[in-house]
From Swiss-Prot:
Residues 466-571, 688-731, 769-929 are annotated as: Disordered. Its main location: cytoplasm. It comes from Homo sapiens (Human). This is E3 ubiquitin-protein ligase CBL-B. Changing residue 363 to E: Decreases affinity for E2 ubiquitin-conjugating enzymes.
Length: 982
């Protein structure tokens, strides 16, 4: 404690002990009387302070000092302080603002303290004279203490005036209970006198004596100015957490513990431990001067080396206990007595995070659960990062930090602390029949299912099934901090279809996450091998879906298929995962996978049919096939890409081949509840249902690609052995959501969709069907009304969105993508991959990879599936959720066994036009020139229904030939009903 009390007056007026005692008496008087009022900190005062600081710098530049360039380095600290003060003044340049700044209580106290510390340093050189050049002298030690104080002051001014703007009244204290104390006693004040602070603290945590109060002040008052700022209070509460026993912790760790060192630097720790180099296990600990609020522990290793470490995500006493048990921290400051700190280890209450119905439904829709960590997709969230609030599992956070990850894995926000949390799963029984329509990590419904009673009924069974699945998935009640940056926090979208989402985190999502159908978190280090998530592995393996010749028979991957990942490989990987690894969460009914809002009424019926009409095995198969097909759908990256593309759902109509208009893919059906698949498919001629199933299937591949960077990949795992029609039928809309699924490589006309559908079928066959023998129910096709790209974007969500408990901030520009975009937004997706691919491959982008490759996701590497770390928040408006949905749908079909599906939609003709369609944008010049009504009439004259013709034209971008080809391939209900009847 002597060290800590001496630290408050590093100047010490030389090394005279009498003067030190006198100063201690003066300090006691100041504590009783309170500090004097500060004069206004006008520009003149600030400039005077600058001159004093400059003088200190010149004195410290004397070569005789031989200052080491290690923290705290005064020759860096004072110039940085000067620059920040200049920045502050530049923000308050006019007279009115400057007057306001000069009267700011905190700023006045800060400038006064800075001036006094500078004068003390100058006086130190005057009085110390030659002793200043002796590295071991007391005067030199006092200069080092002053350097630490200047370092603390710099950190404080930057925290209170970030970017030069005063934010002291909005400063966020990391620990919630400590923040409540400050708000209760001091409101929005930034700084309070020590005397006032001590009295208020005494009301909550009794201070036994005046001596204890002085020792406490020397610990809290980092800037030694007789005031306690909100910044200093935050640091103190983080160092000696938890708040409930903070003074007891402080007494054990700072007052009585022999290993505590106040105002010690890195070099001084090494010098102090040098004498114990022959005694391994010797250790001391200090406040980190570079990371205020954290501890730095120096210790002697078994081979006599001296190391220093900063423990993460645990209180100091826990770190010391663990280190003692492991044989690292045995002798505090070389002493044989090591205090027993186990008494401080009291079970701390965990924050309980309640999963909302919307979140529950959204994650059920994705085939995942809210409590599942979105980084590893293996463990449940059990830690919350402060102050951003993102949630994850401890193992992922630890891995991230051990790999030198900086800040929050999702938003890169500074990690000031962590809190253990427990997720209270949503109990659908408490919410009536609405079990899981769609889960929005931010509590925002992905789709407005309540608007349509029919939709409600059709989704009822799906919700119930999803609830059970979600319950199974929920491995642990613990959840992690919620995001976005974030900035990452998702933003609500104006459309019910639109869903708020967070920007993708900088770290590429893991395949494991995709596999689990969970939003990928940006943690680089936590991202483990995709082995944990078979679906994710699939995504990586799966190339862009190649257009298979017939839906029933797995078509060979056409040239259109992206070369980077052979569909067969992807398929096989997916299949392998599906078979070998059951989905973490119970498979979701196709209904759940097909958002009602996104799908047309008929499409919804298709979804319902898939979920209800088709035997449970089929539904389960679809979800199981993916192993986490719903998870794939949940992939935020995929959804993002879709949002970016903002493909209109209508444009991405669902066809018998299973392809949906890009818009349809982007947005899950929100129409009336899907009727039985068999019924819907026939009524829609399987166009809607098949397309929906295809889109869902496509989404599955996309989610796998997401592993690369949560990039939806429409690469079908070409399951040649499996019929593709069911897959096509099942999630076409979802594929749209993935971006690639929307057109599955044929973002353009129906021909492209056809090829994509075959690919999807292949993927379903090979991957889904192989993994799950049960046929996959076909989701209903989405109605063209959904062609608005914004719908798709609204469905897209980022991993951060799901991870964050934070409510949606607002719509993103991407989320609100204009619904006016042509239904074939998939071209946007194809624009990334298609342009580089041959026409066939372009028409069939690596379902989701292409979309992700769109400029919005330039960072995605289609071939590798890896994506460079984007900024913590990428595109808030990215169609992440839509991608998820499509992936989910895609995976659902994949889960179903193609073999079980007795009948498949007619094989789609080769997509000879697919590449063109992909490259061609939905709003191409040809579409604009041709008379849409005449085209509709012409095709209707050939016996096709108006809705089918309209969807086909939207998908084909008003290209009659392509639309005719689409109708020919998908307009008539494929023989998928047997599969649905699994």
């Amino acid at each position: 404690m002597a060290n800590s009390m001496n630290g408050r007056n590093p100047g010490g007026r030389g090394g005279n002990p009498r003067k030190g005692r006198i100063l201690g008496i003066i300090d006691a008087i100041q504590d009783a009387v309170g500090p004097p009022k500060q004069a206004a900190a006008d520009r003149r005062t600030v400039e005077k302070t600058w001159k004093l600081m400059d003088k200190v710098v010149r004195l410290c530049q004397n070569p005789k000092l031989q200052l080491k360039n290690s923290p705290p380095y005064i020759l860096d600290i004072l110039p940085d302080t000067y620059q920040h003060l200049r920045l502050i003044l530049s923000k308050y340049d006019d007279n009115q603002k400057l007057a306001q700044l000069s009267e700011n209580e905190y700023f006045k106290i800060y400038i006064d303290s800075l001036m006094k510390k500078s004068k003390r340093a100058i006086r130190l050189f005057k009085e110390g004279k030659e002793r200043m050049y002796e590295e071991q002298s007391q005067d030199r030690r006092n200069l080092t203490k002053l350097s630490l104080i200047f370092s603390h002051m710099l950190a404080e001014i930057k925290a209170i005036f970030p970017n030069g703007q005063f934010q002291g009244d909005n400063f966020r204290i990391t620990k919630a209970d400590a923040a409540e104390f400050w708000r209760k006693f001091f409101g929005d004040k930034t700084i309070v006198p020590w005397k006032v602070f001590r009295q208020c603290l005494h009301e909550v945590h009794q201070i036994s004596s005046g001596l204890e109060a002085m020792a406490l002040k020397s610990t809290i008052d980092l800037t030694c100015n007789d005031y306690i700022s909100v910044f200093e209070f935050d640091i103190f509460t983080r160092l000696f957490q938890p708040w409930g026993s903070i003074l007891r912790n402080w007494n054990f760790l700072a007052v009585t513990h022999p290993g505590y060192m106040a105002f010690l630097t890195y070099d001084e720790v090494k010098a102090r431990l040098q004498k114990y180099s022959t005694k391994p296990g010797s250790y001391i600990f200090r406040l980190s001067c570079t990371r205020l609020g954290q501890w730095a522990i120096g210790y002697v290793t078994g081979d006599g080396n001296i190391l220093q470490t900063i423990p993460h995500n645990k209180p100091l006493f826990q770190a010391l206990i663990d280190g003692s048990r492991e044989g690292f921290y045995l002798y505090p400051d070389g002493r044989s007595y090591n205090p027993d700190l186990t008494g401080l280890c009291e079970p701390t209450p965990h924050d309980h995070i309640k999963v909302t119905q919307e979140q529950y439904e959204l994650y059920c829709e994705m085939g995942s659960t809210f409590q599942l960590c979105k980084i590893c997709a293996e463990n449940d969230k059990d830690v919350k990062i402060e102050p951003c609030g993102h949630l994850m599992c401890t193992s992922c956070l630890t891995a991230w930090q051990e790999s030198d990850g900086q800040g929050c894995p999702f938003c890169r926000c500074e990690i000031k602390g962590t809190e253990p949390i427990i997720v209270d799963p949503f109990d659908p029984r408490d919410e009536g029949s609405r079990c899981c329509s769609i889960i929005d990590p931010f509590g925002m419904p992905m789709l407005d299912l309540d608007d349509d009673d029919d939709r409600e009924e059709s989704l009822m069974m799906n919700r119930l099934a999803n609830v059970r699945k979600c319950t199974d998935r929920q491995n642990s009640p613990v959840t992690s901090p919620g995001s976005s940056p974030l900035a990452q926090r998702r933003k609500p979208q104006p459309d019910p279809l639109q869903i708020p989402h967070l920007s993708l985190p900088p770290v590429p999502p893991r395949l494991d996450l995709i596999q689990k159908g969970i939003v990928r978190s940006p943690c680089g280090s936590p991202t483990g091998s995709p082995k944990s998530s078979p679906c994710m592995v699939r995504k990586q393996d799966k190339p862009l879906p190649a257009p298979p010749p017939p839906l029933r028979d797995p078509p060979p991957p056409p040239p259109e298929r992206p070369p980077p990942i052979p569909p067969d490989n992807r398929l096989s990987r997916h299949i392998h995962h599906v078979e070998s690894v059951p989905s973490r969460d119970p498979p979701m009914p196709l209904e759940a996978w097909c958002p009602r809002d996104v799908f047309g009424t008929n499409q919804l019926v298709g979804c319902r049919l898939l979920g209800e009409g088709s035997p449970k095995p089929g539904i389960t198969a679809s979800s199981n096939v993916n192993g986490r097909h719903s998870r794939v759908g949940s992939d935020p990256v995929l959804m993002r890409k879709h949002r970016r593309h903002d493909l209109p759902l209508e444009g991405a109509k669902v066809f018998s081949n299973g392809h949906l208009g890009s818009e349809e893919y982007d947005v899950p059906p929100r129409l009336s509840p899907p009727p039985p698949v068999t019924t819907l498919l026939p009524s829609i001629k399987c166009t809607g249902p098949l397309a929906n199933s295809l889109s869902e299937k496509t989404r599955d591949p996309v989610e796998e690609d997401d592993d690369e960077y949560k990039i939806p990949s429409s690469h079908p795992v070409s399951l040649n052995s499996q019929p593709s029609h069911c897959h096509n039928v099942k999630p076409p809309v979802r594929s749209c959501d993935n971006g690639h699924c929307m057109l599955n490589g044929t973002h353009g006309p129906s021909s492209e969709k056809k090829s994509n559908i075959p690919d999807l079928s292949i993927y379903l066959k090979g991957d889904v069907f192989d993994s799950a023998s049960d046929p996959v129910p076909l989701p209903p096709a989405r109605p063209p009304t959904r062609d608005n790209p914004k719908h798709g974007s609204s469905l897209n969500r980022t991993p951060s969105d799901y991870d964050l408990l934070i409510p949606p901030l607002g719509e993103d520009a991407f989320d609100a993508l204009p619904p006016s975009l042509p239904p074939p937004p998939p071209p946007a997706r194809h624009s990334l991959i298609e342009h580089s691919k041959p026409p066939g491959s372009s028409s069939r982008p690596s379902s989701g990879q292409d979309l992700f490759l769109l400029p919005s996701d330039p960072f995605v590497d289609l071939a590798s599936g890896q994506v460079p770390l984007p900024p913590a928040r990428r595109l808030p408006g990215e169609n992440v959720k839509t991608n998820r949905t499509s992936q989910d749908y895609d995976q659902l079909p994949s889960c179903s066994d193609g073999s079980q599906a007795p009948a498949r939609p007619p094989k789609p003709r080769p997509r000879r036009t697919a590449p063109e369609i992909h490259h061609r944008k939905p709003h191409g010049p040809e579409a604009a020139l041709e008379n849409v009504d005449a085209k509709i009439a012409k095709l209707m004259g050939e016996g096709y229904a108006f809705e089918e013709v309209k969807r086909a034209l939207e998908i084909a971008q008003n290209n009659v030939e392509v639309a005719r080809s689409i109708l020919r391939e998908f307009a008539f209900p494929p023989p998928v009903s047997p599969r649905l009847n699994l």
